[in-house]
């Protein structure tokens, strides 16, 4: 897929670079100096890939993630099993939600990203991660909105974004729009009719 995009852009006179990835992709306007599979796709439990490049003499490491879609506990909070999508009783405690959430491999993948990213930072790279975490941000599930957006009274320290924040990463959306009441950040399926 990535090769076709690069070839199509080339036909239009645009030079872009990419490398093989299984279920996500990275395109770069700048030549790629290295690429790496950080968390390999295995049994449809997500993946993380990394490229390094130089932008105006500055070293950057860019990661793409498509984390495990199973055990998506934000569905559980809304009365649906996060793996089968069948109706279930709505959990009433944060502990119930997080027990389901950590059954996924999202936390394993993000820990592998953090370990690699720390090496990149130590080697002078600026690090950027994007993609589909298949999990909300803990910065969007706070006391002020616990009774909005089907949060059902819960304030949840979602695992992936909590780990990222604890390791010095910044949620850029929340940095630009710090108020989740005026600028809510939603996670929902791409095929949602809204």
What feature does the model see in each segment?
Residues 41-54, 111-121, 125-127, 155, ...:
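Generic detector of contiguous secondary-structure segments
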Residues 32, 67-70, 133-136, 177-179:
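Short, solvent-exposed loop/turn segments at secondary-structure junctions
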Residues 1-3, 62-65, 99-144, 172:
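Active-site beta-strand/loop signature of hydrolases that rely on acidic residues for catalysis
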Residues 7, 11, 115, 162-166:
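Charged/polar, solvent-exposed surface patches and flexible loops
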């Amino acid at each position: 897929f990535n090769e076709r995009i690069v070839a199509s852009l080339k036909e239009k006179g645009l030079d872009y670079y990419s490398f093989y990835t299984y279920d996500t992709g990275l395109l770069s306007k700048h030549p790629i100096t290295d690429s790496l599979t950080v968390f390999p796709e295995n049994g449809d439990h997500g993946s993380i890939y990394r490229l390094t490049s130089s932008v105006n003499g500055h070293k950057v490491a860019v990661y793409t993630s498509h984390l495990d879609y199973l055990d998506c506990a934000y569905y559980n909070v809304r009365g649906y099993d996060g793996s089968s999508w069948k109706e279930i009783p709505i959990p009433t405690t944060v502990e119930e939600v997080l027990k389901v959430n950590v059954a996924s491999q999202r936390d394993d993948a993000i820990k592998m990203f953090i370990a690699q990213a720390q090496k990149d930072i130590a080697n002078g790279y600026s690090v950027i991660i994007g993609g589909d975490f298949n999990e909300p941000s803990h910065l969007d599930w706070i006391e002020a909105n616990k009774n909005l957006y089907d949060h059902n009274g819960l304030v949840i320290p979602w695992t992936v974004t909590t780990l990222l924040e604890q390791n010095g990463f910044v949620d850029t959306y929340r940095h630009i729009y710090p108020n989740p009441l005026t600028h809510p950040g939603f996670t929902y399926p791409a095929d949602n009719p809204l």
